[in-house]
Each structure stands twice: as structure tokens, then as C-alpha cells.
Amino acid sequence: MAKHLFTSESVSEGHPDKIADQISDAVLDAILEQDPKARVACETYVKTGMVLVGGEITTSAWVDIEEITRNTVREIGYVHSDMGFDANSCAVLSAIGKQSPDINQGVDRTDPLEQGAGDQGLMFGYATNETDVLMPAPVTYAHRLVQRQAEVRKNGTLPWLRPDAKSQVTFQYDGGKIVGIDAVVLSTQHAEDIEQNVLHDAVMEEIIKPVLPAEWLNESTKYFINPTGRFVIGGPMGDCGLTGRKIIVDTYGGMARHGGGAFSGKDPSKVDRSAAYAARYVAKNIVAAGLADRCEIQVSYAIGVAEPTSIMVETFGTEKIATEQLTLLVREFFDLRPYGLIQMLDLLHPIYKETAAYGHFGREHFPWEKTDKAQLLRDAAGLK
């Protein structure tokens, strides 16, 4: 592969779409805490002065959706009308129904292992050895930039920052290996009274330099910090936000394919979410085992059917054993039936709100990031 550029972006927890994702997952977590078998599909819409929470939820739990919503917005940092949104005064509307009994009869089974998929669909998982967390570097560092923005905003280092922010990083590759960073974009909402030159210097020193490895930066690296020159109006006042609108930010930054299904607000019976997590787990273990440098897994399902309709392994010519053998190993060591993968990854816990900002993959404490099958795979493949 010749020289090329690759770009990924991320958005902060205060971005309108991410506010919506976090509210949806906060509702999911609150329900799972009381009722692990709940069926939840929770969608959120945010706009100036209002939040609408809707969807289909079947549960024995009772949760205070208004309180969950306000607490989530408050934790993000929207606590004053000067920011364009206020957790204490925004309207919170709820339009929740129950999951269709037609879906229930396809999912629920006497034998849990025969639990059917909650919908048809295709999901992808990916891993690459170009970073220590086995994730693509562009999206990894895009996430770290907006995470750092939130950190210096919340700890008072840069108190004039506001919650809404976006990042974008363009990496240079040569022969498939990273050789540098070509461009960095960081746009951050800020207080009215801050001078742009002060903002520019502070963002450079407190956000960009501490995050991006110096060996990848050079005199030709381009920096675009608030390139419009002003970003006072942000959050839900600047744009409306919806759950599920940042599916590439949530996954691999465009470096792997995507089946189209969003994650936030969905309980683990929805294979859009749980099977995408399982596919990441499979791909990461294959790469961690040294069986390939890059690995993409596709898995697909039919509604109401437990067994996947297909499993595909793609290794982009980096495999150390035949891909047919890799596929057999996946079938042998990973149970990708809906209930099997829920058990395998221990998914019936309130762990989802944290996933809803800064990416669902690449943070080691999530169960789908474990590499506990790597040695088993390596041994079974006959590699020393």
C-alpha cells in the first residue's frame, strides 16, 4: 500500500447527539439496575430548552426519566442558560410505549440459549495492532482530544471552555504504517469574552500537545483551532441532537465497515449493539493472539433465530494462518448466539452510559475489550 492519508473525527460529551446518546443509555442503565431482563429501546431528542425521551420499554422497573435526564445534562456541564442549555430549567417530555408482543415471541424462549435475535441485521467488529488498545489511531486520538477538552473544562484549567466540542485528526500512512499526523482540527465552544488568540494558544498547550505523540508531529502538521473564529452558540441551541447519529464516532472512525445499527438506548437483546460488541471482542482476540495484524469480523442474524446467519473473517492479507481456519476457530471459541454472547461478555449490567461518549471501543475496562481468548486461539492455531 502506497502513501495515503486517513481521517477520523470525534465529538465531546456536550455535543447535542452525544447528549441524546448519554440520556438514552442513562435510562437503560437505571432500568437494568432493577430489571436485567428488561427490553429497552430508548431514543432521545434534544433542542433549545427541551428534551424528548421516547421509545419502547418493557420492564418491571420504575425509573424517574425526568430526574435521570436532568442529572445527565448536569453532569455533562449544561447548568446555565448562558451555555444555551440548562439542566435545571429545560422541559423534559416522555413518550414511552411497550415493546411489541410480535417481537417478544421471537426473542423470548424457555431455553435461554435459544433466545432469538431481537432483529435481523449485520454487524462488524474490527481490530488493528497500530495502537496499544488495538484500535485505529485516527479515531483513538480524536477521542482523546475531546476527552482532554472535557477534562480541562471540568477541572478549571480552562474555565471558559463550554461542553460542546469536535475533533478531527488526519494521519499519514506509508505502506500501511503510521509516519505522522498531517492535520488536526479542534473546535470548542467557549465563553463570549475570551480572545481567539488566547483560546488558540491555550487549546494548543493544554489539549493538543499533551494528547498527540510528539514523534508524529512535525513542521508541516496543520492545526485548525476554532477555524470559524467563534463558537459561543453550541449544544442543543446550536443544533438539535438525536440518539444514534454518531455511529462512526462510536465505532472505528470509518476505518472499518459498519452495519448501520446504532448502540445507545438498546438493551443487549438487540444484536445491533451486543453482536457489534461481540464482533469487536472476536477481532481483538485474533489480533492480540498474533493471528493477524488487522481483522474485521462480520456477523448477521435473522429476527427470532438464535444462530447467526453468517460469520465472515477479513484480515486484509495480514493473516498468519488461512482465513478459513480463522473462521473455524471463531465458531469453536466464541458463542455468537444472542444469549451466548450476553453470557460471554456479561452484558446484563448497567455499564452503558459510559460507552455513550468517547467511543464504545478501545477502553480496556469494558468486557468486550478483554483478550482472554488470545492464548487459546494461538494454541489452537498451532503458533509458537
Swiss-Prot record:
One term of GO molecular function: ATP binding
One of the record's GO cellular component terms: cytoplasm
Chain residues that bind L-methionine: E56, Q99, D239, K270
Residues annotated for Mg(2+) binding in this entry: D17
Pathway: Amino-acid biosynthesis; S-adenosyl-L-methionine biosynthesis; S-adenosyl-L-methionine from L-methionine: step 1/1
Catalytic reaction annotation: L-methionine + ATP + H2O = S-adenosyl-L-methionine + phosphate + diphosphate
InterPro entries assigned to the protein according to its UniProt record, in alphabetical order: ADOMET_SYNTHASE_CS, S-AdoMet_synt_C, S-AdoMet_synt_central, S-AdoMet_synt_N, S-AdoMet_synthetase, S-AdoMet_synthetase_sfam
GO biological process annotation, one example: S-adenosylmethionine biosynthetic process
Cofactor(s) required, per the database record: Mg(2+); K(+)
Family: Belongs to the AdoMet synthase family.
Identification of the protein by name: S-adenosylmethionine synthase
Organism: Cronobacter sakazakii (strain ATCC BAA-894) (Enterobacter sakazakii)
Gene coding for it: metK
